[in-house]
């Protein structure tokens, strides 16, 4: 009987998701300046824009690149570099153009948004997360289903993978006992990589160390303060010795690599009422950071007084797995997770007065809800070169590259109001 009820619930949920998606699609011309939807061969659990951009002469688009991965059913997995053509501001984008045969949106005049896979490198198991090294973006670290963290220099690998499926990383980083997701390169110290793991620890490597046999580098330091799965780790963006970590023990910990005590952080806070899945330091304000949790909230923190949570962002209906500050705007951050939504928040609107109708859609600081995904969002990335452009990937193979309409973040009242999720008013 329970099985029947579960099947019925699933069918109802699927119908609701489909209806919501239809409404979203109908409203895209009002809500977005750009939407590109691309079905990947396999879902990617990870997405990160590379920092470079090419602007071909005489063309109405620029070329950007993404680091992706695969999560296959039992077939060979790959680390993937893809290229994306984004239309210039003066190119005509027609959001109503949907190519049903290709299953992708994106006409700008006669040019359709091109997304192409450029490089595939054999990988051991799915790519839980992949992140490039800021000082040399050709170097990419990956988290695997094993305890190893792999490092690839993609310039040293052919763009088409060896059919044997042999995975040949340039380094193997050892120190963990289990897999995990958190991964962070130090932006101020080249080659210093942090990794978080299900084994309750955080490992630090210096990849400039001389590898042992088999290209293996052992962890330089192992931090053991958490008492449960460590979900995420992140270096501070200005201070080379500071980093933060979050875990299923509901704690946010701040660490200083100059301390000799690797089992006790500088600060430990009970950050949420459930597992803490992600964190992000503000690129403009050295004291501000955000954490996202299974308690469905994003929390805002000030390093100078961690006893006091500055704010709690509430609108998500389920666990939050990713939070990232905008690289272009000090007050803007985004969060995503299991509820299939990516929310963009604006700190500067906290506490603004709202009409009762507006309040029904969410708090004033909820700037935008991206409703284009029909499955859990695994990861997203703000484009470093094009303000307000985000790439998001979901568990159903879909990758979307999108930009909310300029009038939404410009504080101008658009003609005919549309609530943030495009469910029309």
Swiss-Prot record:
It is found in: Nucleus; Chromosome, Telomere. One of its GO terms (molecular function) is histone binding. Residues 361-406 are annotated as: Interaction with HAT1. SUPFAM superfamilies: WD40 repeat-like (SSF50978). Its main location: nucleus. GO terms for biological process: chromatin remodeling; DNA repair; DNA replication; DNA replication-dependent chromatin assembly; regulation of DNA-templated transcription. The keyword Cell cycle applies. Belongs to the WD repeat RBAP46/RBAP48/MSI1 family. This is Histone-binding protein RBBP4. It comes from Gallus gallus.
